Swiss-Prot record:
Entry GO terms, CC: membrane; trans-Golgi network
Active-site annotation: S193, D388, H445
Cytoplasmic side: 542-618
Biased composition (Basic and acidic residues): 605-618
Topology class, membrane: Single-pass type I membrane protein
Gly residues bias spans: 574-583
Protein name: Pheromone-processing carboxypeptidase KEX1
Stored InterPro entries: AB_hydrolase_fold, Peptidase_S10, Ser_caboxypep_his_AS
SUPFAM superfamilies (alphabetical): alpha/beta-Hydrolases
GO biological process per UniProt: apoptotic process; proteolysis
Catalytic activity: Preferential release of a C-terminal arginine or lysine residue
Gene behind the chain: KEX1
PANTHER family cross-referenced by the UniProt entry: PHEROMONE-PROCESSING CARBOXYPEPTIDASE KEX1 (PTHR11802:SF190), SERINE PROTEASE FAMILY S10 SERINE CARBOXYPEPTIDASE (PTHR11802)
Gene3D superfamilies: alpha/beta hydrolase (3.40.50.1820)
Amino acid sequence: MLSAIWTGFVTLFLCSFVQGAPADNVLPSAASFYVPSIPGIIPNPDYRLQIYAGHLPAESNKTLLASNDVTAHLYFVMVKNRRVADKERVVFWFNGGPGCSSFDGLMMEVGPWRWDGQPEGKESFIVKEGGWEEYTTMVFVDQPPGTGFSFTSTDQYAKTMKDAQWHILEFLRNFYQVFPEVLTMDTYLAGESFAGQWIPYFADAILESSLQIPLRGIAIGNGWMDARRQYLSYLDYSLKMGLIKDNSEDWKEVKAAHDRCEAHLEKLEGDPIHIRECGSIIMKVINQKRPDNEKGEKMCLNMYDVRFTDTSPACGLNWPPEMHAITHFLGRKDVVRALHAERHPGSWVECRRPVHRAFKDGEEESSITVLPRVLSKIPVLIFAGDQDLICNYVGLENMIKSLTWNGETGLGTVETQSWSVNSTATGTWVESRNLTYVKIFNASHMAPFDLPHVTHDMMLRFMGVNFSSIVGGSAMIPSSLGDAAKPVFVGGHLPQPSTPALPAGKTPEQDKAMWEAYYNAGSAALVLVLIMLVIGLFIWYRRRKSRLQLPSNQSGELAEESIPLRSEMEDRGGNGVSNGGAWKGKARASEPVFEVGDSDEDEPSPYRKPDGGGDRNV
């Protein structure tokens, strides 16, 4: 009796002080996601960053899961805008795959910092101009579950676009509960490569949902969207770019693969995302015979930037060179802790192959079938770096020519305009019936990596930013579209901005987040002390009671709590390159099968079932 009373007292005492694990429908506060600093990111006093990061559930609390399944969580990093133009805007950024982390976009393309060039182990990153966060809040999302720092059970990886749509809607539902102010911002989705599939499907789901998100447009860079046209573009692109010579032996091999693909497409129904029978075309292009390098290694064409070569069979998978430093950086425990990513066991990898393989099982219709429906509701930007082979501009232009939307096929008779940034010819620009197509000169598969200021200007124009309302930073870079030049104020004639640039130091919002975080940390420490005190008293009481009682002949053995998940993960270097070959890039160059999106090695999963069952389809 006394034991029961004591147990009840302890329970009530603990409940009065301890905030336990939140229920499925209880989310952490915004302050708990606040990132005051990141080790290895060299701050710039002129560019004050507000960063929030962490995991949010990507499943409804009504979802029926097995007892040993993990609730899917997506990981995000939000960088709030440093300056405000005419209105608040937010861009959700997605990289490709399937299974590739949006840290590619954050660390190398549209984020606020760049690698300093130091070797792996000594790397740091410098905050500098060119990031899209200057005038726009950026949210980088690792999806589907299992990608980057996101996690789920291995048998719960997304298998279809519907799975991925559902996860992103649940994530957004929770995201807006934590950050309700973002729901009032003009919203855009952007990304590249296989995000050409994700983004139209996500936009369609958002527009049909009850979330009431003010989605104003989507932007896709060098996207994989229309397999029928894009596979058949490799021959034409290679000839235009001088990668092969007409009627040469190389041309004959590429042409034979092209003809086999074309014959297969004539019999094929529907618009699938991948067509295995067509994958050999690009392999014929990149694997033309070339002289060995000085180390005697075989060389091939970089499929993401045809200005470069790479060792075989990587053929671009070793590019960009920043990836090794980024992978090492994101493997540091202090960085993982600062980014609130500890819940993800094991090392970060750029692209996770089991996620990639699980998704490919579905018989999926390409996003080209969804795009006309999206175009009937919101503007769409398709941009293409002209040095990319794998998702080249020729294929995208052929796609647009054959696409029917808003009552017509193709762009029609609209005029293509010249576009320049900083007095340099940058590309061409054309708009028709909600579709904007931009070809960017001297840019690769990752156009923002090559030309950050150029792609930033492009995005500001697409979002309709009033250039007269912004000053400082990129506002000082001249640009023009056709005959219309962006207003640039110089000398002593700068007007007062509609909303001034954010000053150095912390804003009231940051101070609030910081003090709330301190308060939570102090409260947690106090609670921990009280818990230890109560537990100590309880143990003392139990030991004293056991000395006064007769020994029990009942077995005191307790079944160990069933732990449904195993958290081991082999560390194979974390660089996305397996012992058996190169897997870093957006395709598997060792196989004659075209796949947009990186794939890492077959690593043991952190969420493997306790019966020893392996990853699905691995």
